[in-house]
Amino acid sequence: WLSEQIASLAAGAAINRYPDADPRSLKDIIRTVIDLPRDLDILLGNGSDEIIQLLALATAKQNAVLLSVEPSFVMYKMVAAFTGMQYVGVPLANDFTLDVPALLAAIEQQQPALMFLSYPNNPSGNLFDAQAMARIIEAAPGLVVVDEAYYNFAGSSFLPMIKRHPNLLVMRTFSKLGMAGLRLGFLAGSKTWLGQLEKLRLPYNISVLTQLVAKQLLRSHDVLQSQAEQIKRDRVMVYERLEAIDGVQPYPSAANFILFRVRYAGKIFQGLKERGVLIKDLSRAHPLLSDCLRVTIGTPQENECFVQALQESVRQCV
């Protein structure tokens, strides 16, 4: 029934008109869904990628540093290059947890204008220790953006911490809730910061169709969240199935995917592909990801096909 409602909205959309340049009604629905206090504000972006670029543009003075951890979301490094910022990546520990001493030392030495921390982290899927995150936010001289793209699969958020840390902003996207094609993300934070960032936001960056469809979907947020809850249950099942395969080491995940390490990852990836299953080969993306592959949780049928194909591929490579 949601598909029918969306089709009806699209059919009646005034696409001959410019979109609302500051869609307050959409912001209000988002504010209600995330229970954001009135003294904080929201900035909308054409996906979180646009917001990452906007933040970099706002802080990209000469020799300004953008700092993040590695491995993490590749867009942080890419946007630093696009905007002329110096990128500094601090490696995570071998178990993908934060290396707090190394991060604090990098902050002290580099004095970053902008920091990104993915929570849960992409591609490892784990939630960093909240107390360690707080120490890093307090030590940072510039803006710290907590990227909560996978919040709906984790349930843990830094939104309540914004008032405690004046340099903290929280970013989310609706892509992981089945709205990737709409390209809609948002940044939450103090009105002071967002008021300045709004000056750099391009007008009409959220299309007429995106505004209409997003509002309709967010009015049915309970349906979307129930889908996320199902993915969380399926994630447990897939993790347990992976644990049971000799030679496969899955990593605990709070996202909608699972990272796992397996010998001959390249051959396993090809074996899966030959069996009609396409996942992400991260084995050459970063030294810490050696022999790592990442699978997104799908439908129960897709998950079963993946597990069976993986079992066959592992047996073939032994």
Q: Where are the model-predicted features located?
A:
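Conserved PLP-binding catalytic core of the aspartate aminotransferase-like
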Residues: I231-K232, V236, L242-R275
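PLP-dependent enzyme catalytic core of the Aspartate aminotransferase-like
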Residues: E274-R275, R284-V318
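PLP-dependent aminotransferase class I/II
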Residues: N167-A244, Q249-P250
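Active-site phosphate-binding strand-loop segment of PLP-dependent enzymes
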Residues: N94-E148, N152
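N-terminal small-domain helix-loop-helix segment of the aminotransferase-like
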Residues: W1-D49, L54
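Short beta->alpha connector loops at strand-helix junctions that form conserved
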Residues: E70, G89-N94, E148, R172, ...
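PLP-dependent aminotransferase-like
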Residues: N16, A58-L117
